[in-house]
């Protein structure tokens, strides 16, 4: 097998996020520590202290969030972890916060439709990623002494067979160029969700309304595609 393009050019992003309107109103909040020092901005849904939303039980990111919460001293800073119960409820908590213009702080990932609908700022963990620490402790249920760490990076590539690489010709030329930033994918997923569209509908919407694909094909193919649209 061979790697072609890194299809998510921003990688698959995971981490802790806050609404963009909170970030805009509080430009001093750039890191996880900054947010944890502003418990007043992130009310707990039960009205007692501040909240940080983790992943639902059974998701590995819950272990990582819980361990990083301990590493950064979240409880001592007035926060309690909220388990949303499901991926849908986690997304719903973001939508509800946006609807009320309230603070929200917690785990999410990109690209996703939710981040296409509700602009969010990913916060820095303000330390380099330590992969050994991540594998031995940050991501483990029995992590006794978690240390500060940055979230692991998830690279996402298109992979092709040896035969495809050797025989596909212009198909391979296309595959090695096809990559999109997460903001574009977020927006496309949000459009697809809002319009209850099919994958084919979303592809046509992309071709008609975005220009990233222009660099994936030669000028002749581009002209034919535009004429067909």
Where are these regions (language model features)?
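A conserved helix-loop-strand patch within extracytoplasmic ligand-binding domains
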Residues: 1-53
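Soluble non-cytosolic domains of exported or imported proteins
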Residues: 10, 25-29, 56-60, 84-88, ...
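A bilobed periplasmic-binding-protein/Venus flytrap-type ligand-binding module shared by bacterial periplasmic
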Residues: 13-25, 154-167, 190-191
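Extracytoplasmic/secreted envelope proteins and their assembly/folding machinery
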Residues: 32, 36, 62, 66, ...
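Sec-exported extracytoplasmic/periplasmic mature domains
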Residues: 37-41, 70-74, 95-99, 176-180, ...
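Ligand-binding pocket segment of bilobal, Venus flytrap-like solute-binding proteins
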Residues: 53-134
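C-terminal lobe and pocket-closing loops
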Residues: 114-179
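C-terminal functional modules
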Residues: 164, 172-229
């Amino acid at each position: 097998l061979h790697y072609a393009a890194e299809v998510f050019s921003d990688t698959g992003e995971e981490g802790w996020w806050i609404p963009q309107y909170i970030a805009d109103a509080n430009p001093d909040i750039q890191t996880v520590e900054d947010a944890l020092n502003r418990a007043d901005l992130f009310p707990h849904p039960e009205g007692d202290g501040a909240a940080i939303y983790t992943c639902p039980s059974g998701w590995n990111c819950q272990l990582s969030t819980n361990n990083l919460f301990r590493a950064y001293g979240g409880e001592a800073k007035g926060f309690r972890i909220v388990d949303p119960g499901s991926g849908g409820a986690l997304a719903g908590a973001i939508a509800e916060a946006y609807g009320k213009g309230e603070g929200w702080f917690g785990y999410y990932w990109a690209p996703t439709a939710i981040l296409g609908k509700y602009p969010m700022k990913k916060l820095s963990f303000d330390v380099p990623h330590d992969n050994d620490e991540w594998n031995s402790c940050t991501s483990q249920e029995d992590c006794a002494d978690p240390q500060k760490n940055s979230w692991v990076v998830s690279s996402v590539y298109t992979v092709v067979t040896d035969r495809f690489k050797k025989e596909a010709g212009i198909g391979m030329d296309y595959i090695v160029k096809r990559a999109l930033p997460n903001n574009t994918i977020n927006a496309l997923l949000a459009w697809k969700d809002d319009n209850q569209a099919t994958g084919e509908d979303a592809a046509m919407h992309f071709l008609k309304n975005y220009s990233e694909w222009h660099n994936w094909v030669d000028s002749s193919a581009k002209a034919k595609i535009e004429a067909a649209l």
